[in-house]
């Protein structure tokens, strides 16, 4: 059992955070989405890969399956893996919605949400395991 005083974390380089913010600002008012790639089982995001939101919605996102497959294959060919998924909340807090929780496919992934509700974008990360949400600290490298 993990130490409850130690919060989980994900390391996201400032350049990657900049890419995420730029995508979210470009796509608003629609939600944006993409994948974080790093070493398998790692909590260090080395890359961000934007995906098309096939839902074309202000309130939900659906990753284009072709983008997902392309990014996953490319990562695997280079000995890397998808370690997290990113999407934006354009008008709400950066906290997982019931839909986000219900559709969380991998308990090992980080679920990163950038909120655009306020003047300054706010990026937060979570783990979603068996419907339970726990926040992870984002460490900018």
What are these model-predicted stretches?
Residues 88:
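Metallo-beta-lactamase
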